């Protein structure tokens, strides 16, 4: 005799134990089902018939006994092989229909084929054909809530047939239907049986059971009667045989669909779920959007500030060295740089220009207006050393320096604050301290060189005039030195160091720095500031990630039955994992892109408000990548939880 498709031997199923009472639902069920049979399993509520169906459909495992499918011991099959059986061999028709609420009739029917890796065009054509065959051609786009009970059950039957449905497991298929719809469903099952499908009908209604060719009655977990025929049904040869199913199982369980197609399907399904729950999705996205926007804007502001400061510092020249006496210590007095040192340094071949500087903030008055500004005594090399010319009038001359003339060149901010708008500044007088100085020139605008120091708020006077008329001494505060070659700043620094050690009897009582080093130090400071801003903003992205995890955990709880339905139609654990992980990633991707768009809008607004902003592509890409990684990290736990759900418990959850 041919190998039976299904063979149960002394199957037992018990629940509870350890801390709860042990209840044995099935107590030694033995039966065989051959190709082409239409079997009705009938029994009262609580007799164990639904538990038996779950075991037959590989949704549950027995506590004891042997279950062989097409000659293979089901206990030896792994989770992927069991999923293959649910997907390719079995087709489930449930009393409660068990359709995905967010999917259309077409999408519900296509589901088993998606998990089988069937190309989109092929499965869409087959799903449409099945729905048309069952009288639902005009309802393919309708969601379950838009269908009657009978229509939903026909969608469920079409889904069961999608991958062939060689064995239809129908659990009380007419239980929730009116008599007319119930009769239509039974007529469909009769038709399928005549075509060679194995039909296993679970029911408590003996009238419904009488439609089957074979009736098995169970009571209290035991088979009490079985009207098995001696000969197989006449149409048994039309159905698939055990040997063919076994060969297909051996081949198919190790085959996987194209990962690109599977990923695309998961992302499309994720988008549908997000769109259906738009309001909740928007609330969830807020955390990611704010996080990404904060990171991008903070880094852009930091980068803009850095570039602005670097440009302003570089505007003074990168070949400048600064020399001043070392500060006093407990053992040594403060170092002192004299004008003789200045003259000696000026003789070095590496030095292009040298300038002693005397300066401090002083009260400046003009008419009734008085304010404090930095007043510096410099020589005529000031414009060349600092690349800072006079744009109106002229800079003071060597003659002015030699005669200690009371003339001044003022910055743009001094002009703005002290002189009347529209007036000619050249020739006007400013009272610096108690000494009147005539304005002979206006410096070009420079802005802030670093921090909050505004270079345009300064007044430049001849060094000799500052020493005699304002400060009463000729010892410079520091020396500004322009190297002849900007590529030889280090060599120039070394030459000055050697010269001063010789002049100061070997003492290193001076400090020598260069603008290039200052610019590098400022760059490091600005980078640290940018990193700090980015780290602060990243915290909001982390909070957004936690929000994604929370919503995904809630989604898993809400969609537990959907997960069970997907497993019943052949989804493997990795399919469920990919599905929910795709939703988390989709959330993060949409949130990331929206956050970047928001950041660009905010950046444009800041630019209009004269705040320096510089968007960097690596920062934008990095923020987006972090958002996606956040989705993966925080979405993995909920997705893993969903993938590990028990199919039976998931199906029966509320």
Curated annotation (Swiss-Prot):
After gene disruption, what is the outcome? Answer: Deletion of pvdRT-opmQ leads to reduced amounts of PVD in the medium and decreased growth under iron limitation. Deletion of both PvdRT-OpmQ and MdtABC-OpmB systems strongly affects growth under iron limitation as well as PVD secretion.
Q: What broad class describes the main subcellular location of this protein?
A: membrane
> Which keywords does this chain's UniProt record carry?
Antibiotic resistance, ATP-binding, Cell inner membrane, Cell membrane, Membrane, Nucleotide-binding, Translocase, Transmembrane, Transmembrane helix, Transport
The record's subcellular locations are: Cell inner membrane
Q: Where does ATP bind?
A: 43-50
- Give residue ranges for domain ABC transporter: 6-245
Q: Which SMART domains match?
A: AAA
Q: Name one GO cellular component term.
A: plasma membrane
Record carries keyword ATP-binding: yes
Q: Which GO BP terms apply?
A: response to antibiotic
Spell out the InterPro entries in the cross-references: AAA+_ATPase (IPR003593), ABC3_permease_C (IPR003838), ABC_transporter-like_ATP-bd (IPR003439), ABC_transporter-like_CS (IPR017871), MacB-like_ATP-bd (IPR017911), MacB_PCD (IPR025857), Macrolide_Exporter_MacB (IPR050250), P-loop_NTPase (IPR027417)
EC no.? 7.6.2.-
**Domain of life from the UniProt record:** Bacteria
- Relate the induction remark in this record: Expression is stimulated by iron limitation.
Activity regulation comment:
Has a basal ATPase activity that is stimulated by PvdR. In vitro, interaction with PVD influences the affinity of PvdT to PvdR.
Molecular function (GO) terms for this protein are: ATP binding; ATP hydrolysis activity; transmembrane transporter activity
Q: What does this protein do?
A: Part of the tripartite efflux system PvdRT-OpmQ required for the secretion into the extracellular milieu of the siderophore pyoverdine (PVD), which is involved in iron acquisition. This subunit binds PVD and drives its secretion by hydrolyzing ATP. The system is responsible for export of newly synthesized PVD after the final steps of biosynthesis have taken place in the periplasm.
Q: Name it.
A: Pyoverdine export ATP-binding/permease protein PvdT
Q: Look up and give the organism this protein is from.
A: Pseudomonas putida (strain ATCC 47054 / DSM 6125 / CFBP 8728 / NCIMB 11950 / KT2440)
**Gene name in the database record:** pvdT
